[in-house]
């Protein structure tokens, strides 16, 4: 629907005139408009669908290698409760964090929890 149209327009506008190597070198940060400035978090299913769509749009216009190389990160009420599930998603390459990292303790707690979840999702063991 409309969200897909807006995503396509934003990506095409930002990358107008760029070649595939440049499109693949960009870090794409996604946050649902309705989540900006709120404590309302998107479900992991919603985030997976949106990030998959972003990657598909990049692939359609700049090719699969650009889509695979692109880094797509998520923000939108990321916190210690939902961060592990979000970072474990296949198309989520990282997180950008707001109020959950306003303090050093909050930031380090989230980094530790998310790093452990990322390692577990990849089959590695956290130290």
Give short role names for the model-derived ranges.
Residues 1-67:
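Active-site rim beta-loop-alpha module in soluble metabolic enzymes
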Residues 74-80, 99-101:
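Glycine-rich beta-to-alpha transition loops that act as phosphate-gripper elements at the mouths
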Residues 31, 86, 98:
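Conserved, mostly hydrophobic/aromatic
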Residues 69-72:
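Alpha/beta-hydrolase fold nucleophile elbow
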